[in-house]
């Protein structure tokens, strides 16, 4: 690859307003390809292409504003450019904007918007979005806690060798094991309670039956009253 020649040709085309050339030249200035790094010039070139609607340039410009590359950090501008690229279906922009909604960078926290954007990015296989959305499901942010879905998403990211996802997956797996143990313990406790209640009811029934039997037996075996018969004559004979 002849980066020097590519940089020269891109510069000539970019000066004529060619959107792809502006984007490429911005990339080359950003990474020092074909010459020295020039971060302010990279920001300028990406800005020109972004204004013409180039989604890749919009993402790059959003990131430069986010980290303060080639100029000051500006979360509001970062969020704006990510938003424009995300609206074009750019997966990285959707993931980055989703995370900004989670942390309230460049605007208020909005978990609902974050879940929606991250979901769109996940559908395109974006690993960062898989991790972030997995964490949201685990923490119950923007919806109910769903450890099963959290694990599924983190495993998708792990399959792409996403850095750091293993630690998050260990936490989720541990929580899943603890939840299953608790559910088993709760089920066992409930069963024990039901058995105890059933045993108690049986004891009460047996005691009541025994008491009734005692009452019935006493009535049938009691001796008749021994009232002496009266004599029809006078006194007893001598």
Where on the chain are the PLM-derived regions?
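Short helix-capping/linker turns of helical repeat alpha-solenoids
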Residues: 16-18, 31-33, 52-54, 67-69, ...
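Hydrophobic face of amphipathic alpha-helices that form TPR/SEL1-like repeat modules
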Residues: 24-31, 60-67, 96-103, 132-139, ...
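Primarily low-complexity, compositionally biased regions used by nucleic-acid-associated proteins
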Residues: 167-203
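Intrinsically disordered, low-complexity polybasic segments
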Residues: 200-221
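Intrinsically disordered, low-complexity regulatory segments in nuclear proteins
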Residues: 220-238
